[in-house]
From Swiss-Prot:
Keywords: Glycosyltransferase, Metal-binding, Potassium, Transferase. GO terms for molecular function: 1,4-alpha-oligoglucan phosphorylase activity; deoxyuridine phosphorylase activity; metal ion binding; thymidine phosphorylase activity; uridine phosphorylase activity. It comes from the Bacteria. It holds the Pfam family Glycos_transf_3. PROSITE patterns: THYMID_PHOSPHORYLASE (PS00647). NCBIfam families: PRK05820.1, PRK06078.1, Y_phosphoryl. This is Pyrimidine-nucleoside phosphorylase. It catalyses: uridine + phosphate = alpha-D-ribose 1-phosphate + uracil; thymidine + phosphate = 2-deoxy-alpha-D-ribose 1-phosphate + thymine; 2'-deoxyuridine + phosphate = 2-deoxy-alpha-D-ribose 1-phosphate + uracil. The keyword Manganese does not apply. Homodimer. It comes from Staphylococcus aureus (strain COL). Disulfide bonds: none annotated. Its EC number is 2.4.2.2. Binds 1 K(+) ion per subunit.
Length: 433
């Protein structure tokens, strides 16, 4: 088999066999196939696309290029959730203890964040003493005992994806549905999930700006999952404004605690209940979405979800008293109110710009080596559709420096106030095939 033949075959619009895809991925990881041939094939895929069988084969070739996490010692159906990312996306922090409270095992492998704010692990590390460096045996034991544990990414998972992703980044082949879908799904499958719930974001603060693109990606990932024996479904949710009100690590953790108490923002609560209901059904803990939703609401109202979060924090060395004493979380030195320059209704909150503003305060990383300030960030006091009076606070800047003129300038271009009301949509579609 020759790589040049595989490139020409895809260039001319033909279907690649599983053997050809395995030959490419295997050879590329070993270094037998050079970057220039891999980038040539990536560009051919970009223009000629792949069918469902090719996408599934590419995903599994990347899964098999490295280690797979074995979660077979954990009792029950392991359901994982993946979000394509957004601003203020606190769902994992709420979902993990919430679904665990209704007996769904959550064995979560998470990373650190690049971009607007930290990842799930950075947010949890805002809790004094919390650690994620636990061995596999302890991880399995914690999930079996308490139904939830979070561990840092370790081992040699999907090395082919890491290599191909870096190549796509510099060869103009990032925005290819088969390449994005196989990249995301290979990581989820290698992490040991039996079933997968996907939260595909669309809008100004999302990777997929249009609903059409988000749908195409959601369908692609759901089909890959179902084709390789993992029950998979996707929700397409809106990221035209940040989710919830908090953007920043300790601030988002505080918001997660409020949500588990039943006092969280409406949009975050609704998205968590929608995603959580799907997870509960896939884990065979409820027969219908309505029944699953009722179980989750009861877990919040009874305090079981909050109690689960406390035990989870304690199990991983953290100070669980932060649940009742949020002032023990990292606090920024200055709170600066950003006020409305006129009266009207909020019609636009550009997620990316608000994310960048929080990053300028120190809440996110530009490179893996950067330190982040867990205390800083932005809290939205108004969301799209809210009425606002001139001089009223639109948002609060939590900062460890007094001069935030650069941040204010960024925010000036990210908020629009008009004289008409806009009603935002939160959940656009649910995709099951």
């Amino acid at each position: 088999m020759r790589m040049i033949d595989i490139i020409e075959k895809k260039r001319d619009g033909h279907t690649l066999t599983t053997e050809e895809i395995n030959f490419f991925i295997g050879g590329y990881v070993k270094g037998d196939i050079p970057d220039y041939q891999a980038s040539s094939l990536a560009m051919a895929i970009y223009f000629q696309d792949m069918n469902d069988d090719e996408r599934a084969a590419l995903t599994m070739a990347m899964v098999n290029s490295g280690d797979m996490i074995d979660l077979s010692d954990i009792k029950g159906v392991k359901v994982d959730k993946h979000s394509t990312g957004g601003v203020g996306d606190t769902t994992t922090l709420v979902l993990a203890p919430l679904v665990a409270a209704v007996d769904v095992p959550v064995a979560k492998m998470s990373g650190r964040g690049l971009g607007h704010t930290g990842g799930t692990i950075d947010k949890l590390e805002a809790i004094d003493g919390f650690h994620v460096e636990i061995d596999e045996a302890t991880f399995v034991k914690l999930v079996n005992e308490n139904k939830v544990a979070v561990v840092g990414q370790s081992g040699n998972l999907t090395p082919a994806d890491k290599k191909l992703y870096a190549l796509r980044d510099v060869t103009g082949t990032v925005n290819s549905i088969p390449l994005i879908a196989s990249s995301i799904m290979s990581k989820k499958i290698a992490a040991g999930a039996d079933a997968i719930v996907l939260d595909v974001k669309t809008g100004s603060g999302a990777f997929m700006k249009t609903l059409e693109d988000a749908e195409a990606l959601a369908h692609a990932m759901v089909r890959i999952g179902n084709n390789v024996g993992r029950n998979t479904m996707a929700i397409i949710s809106d990221m035209n404004q940040p989710l919830g009100r908090a953007i920043g690590n300790a601030l988002e953790l505080q918001e997660a605690i409020d949500t588990l108490k039943g006092q969280g923002p409406k949009d975050l609560t609704e998205l968590v209940l929608t995603l959580g209901s799907q997870m509960v059904v896939l884990a065979n803990k409820a027969e219908t979405l309505e029944e699953a939703r009722a179980l989750l609401i009861e877990a919040i109202n009874s305090g079981a979800a909050l109690e689960k979060f406390k035990t989870f924090i304690k199990n991983q060395g953290g100070d669980e008293t932060v649940i009742d004493h949020p002032e023990r979380l990292p606090q920024a030195q200055y709170q600066i109110e950003y006020k409305a320059k006129k009266s009207g209704y909020v019609t636009e909150l550009v997620s990316n710009d608000i994310g960048v503003a929080s990053m300028m305060l120190g809440a996110g990383r530009l490179t893996k080596e950067d330190d982040i300030d867990l205390a800083v960030g932005i809290v939205l006091n108004k969301k799209i559709g809210d009425k606002v009076e001139e001089g009223e606070s639109l948002l609060t800047i939590h900062s460890n420096r007094q001069d935030v003129d650069d941040v204010v300038k960024k925010l000036d271009s990210s908020i629009t106030i008009a004289d008409h009301v806009v009603s935002p949509t939160l959940i656009h579609k649910i995709i099951t095939e």
